[in-house]
Each structure stands twice: as C-alpha cells, then as structure tokens.
Amino acid sequence: MKPLLFALCAVFAFGGLSAQQTAWQPSPGHTQVPIWPGAVPDAQPVTGPEVARTTVREWLVAGRPAVGVSNVSRPTMTRYSPDGKNTGAAVVVFPGGGYLDLAIDLEGTEVCDWLTAKGITCVLLKYRVPGEPGYPKPASYPKSGPYPESPMALEDAQRTMGLVRFHAAEWHIDPHKIGVLGFSSGGHLVAAMSTHFAKRLYPAVDAADKESCRPDFAVAIYPGHLSLSAAQWDAKQGAKKVVIHYLATADKDLGLNPDIPVTHQTPPTFLLQAEDDNVDNVNDSLAYYIALKSAGVPVEMHLFARGGHAFGLRRTKFPITGWPQLVETWLGTIAMISK
C-alpha cells in the first residue's frame, strides 16, 4: 500500500461524504449473524457506533456512489443463497478499505449478487475495522491493519470459514468447494487466509472451530500488502518491524511479504490487477504469483494496462472490469463449478 493510501484507497477515502447513516443493514430477506457468540477475541476499544457513509459525486465509481462502513467492532456474516440452480460452491467475500473501513456494496453485496446469479452461495463477512478512516492516527487509537499488525480481520475470517463448513449440509454447500474472494486489503486477507490456516489465532469457541479454515480456492482482486516493498511501507506505519531488515539482498519489489508464508498447501489462486493501480502496486500481485509458482500452487494471473483501483464489479470503459467472466471460467477449470 503506497502513500496514496493516505487518501484511503482513492474512492474510499470518504474525504467528501453525504449524510452519515446508521449502522449498515443488508437488503430485505437477508440477516446479519454475529460470528462470535460471546466475547470477541483481541477486542479493541470502540471509538463510536458503527456507521455507513455514502460517497458524494466527487467519489463515484462507474457513475454511482458507494457505501463504506467503519467502526465495526462486532463482526457479522450475511448469507446469500443461489438464485435457481445451486452449484454447491460457496465464496466468503472480504470487502476492501485499507483495514480502516469496508466497501460494503461495491466490493460486497454487489459481488454476492453476481455469485448467487451463477449458482454460488455467497457469505459476506463484515470483519472488524474498529475506528474511523483517515491518517494519521494517535498512538491510543484502536489498532487495525494486516496480520500480524492486528489479528482481528484474520480471526474473523478463520471463524467464518469454520462456520460455513460447519453449516455446509444445512446450507446445501459442498464442504470441499468453499473459497474466498477479496479486494485490495481484502485481497491481502485472502492471501493471509490461504497461508495461515493450520492453526486458529484464537481459542476454540465451539464445534465450528474444529472445521478446517483452509479455503479450497482463492481470488484476490487488486490485492495489497503482499510485496516486500509494501510490507516495508506497512512497517513504517507501525506494523511488524522485522520486515525492515528481512532479506536485505532480496528484490524488494518482487520479493514476497514474509508474513505470507506460501507453501504447496496454499489453495489454487486467481489474481487480477491493473498496471496503473496507484493504490496497491501491481508488484503485489506479481510477488504473490512468483511465490505461488515457486511452491507449485496452481495460479492464474491477469494483468491489464489500465483500470486503476477500487472498481469492484462495476463496468467501466476498461476491459479489466470484465473480470467476473474470467473468474467464472477459472472456477470451471479447477472443477469448483461445471464448465
């Protein structure tokens, strides 16, 4: 994540906002379910109530506003069932927002609309981002960020994957066809889930935590925090300092963040990014791709010359925004859905 993050991921800076709304609620017919039945692990101080904000016309995406959610201290999941035919596959979706807020519609509910139309169950995770977007932060501010700077988002993701597997039969899901899809910081969370599944970061709560939290496949769209240079930038903002001196002779642009320990057990992965992305550098995808290939992990990557950052599924003049068809084809290639 480059210094432009001080504008908070371009669109989701919310430097110009419309009227502040109440806490986010899903569309009628869908219910948010708290993922933690009791105390939330590694809870941070709450700076205020959860709020949803809508961007004003200076921050439109494909001519439409977007909604960002911040001050999330009680994470939830919302399940969206397939329309018509059920493929048996499921995807847990991680919206982006720099680990400071969540692009809940652009990179959340709109993704679920697409997935369910393709016969895929979607589970939207509203993971913890306990505070308001924007920099700089005082030392006393709730700590959030990529793992291991903060364990909260990864804990929420691990817990949700276990819950989806635990309820697979009830929800008509194949427990061996459950993947993850994320954007920007949510793309980093995809990589973290793909490489930190052997052990939960929190004490087991119930039977759901006995289920594997390894995704069966992973989709990272314009991911951040993955290259060594991105990790070094994160470290200067207060993340794990070890990356500053990690492999001083390594290529900092194409070397992988050491907190993403890729192995041959990392699930098959799809990567997509634009070369003119000025929030998360294309080297984040390249570094992860190289590490995956080196470990023998099936991986497909699509790089486009133009397209920028934070476009979600909204079609623009740039070909990169046709990526959902590429993902659908790839899911057939790896036998998660029928071709």
Question: Model segments located where?
Answer:
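Short beta-strand element of the alpha/beta-hydrolase
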Residues: 88-96
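N-terminal cap/lid segment of alpha/beta-hydrolase-fold proteins
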Residues: 21-86
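C-terminal catalytic histidine-bearing segment of alpha/beta-hydrolase fold enzymes
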Residues: 272, 279-339
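Cap/lid segment of the alpha/beta-hydrolase catalytic domain
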Residues: 55, 98-107, 117, 124-152, ...
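Primarily recognizes the serine-hydrolase "nucleophile elbow" in alpha/beta-hydrolase
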Residues: 152-235, 253, 258
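Acidic catalytic loop of the alpha/beta-hydrolase fold
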Residues: 226-227, 276-280
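Active-site glycine-rich loops that stabilize anionic/oxyanionic intermediates
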Residues: 95-100, 275
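Short beta-strand/loop motif that positions the catalytic acidic residue
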Residues: 265, 271-273
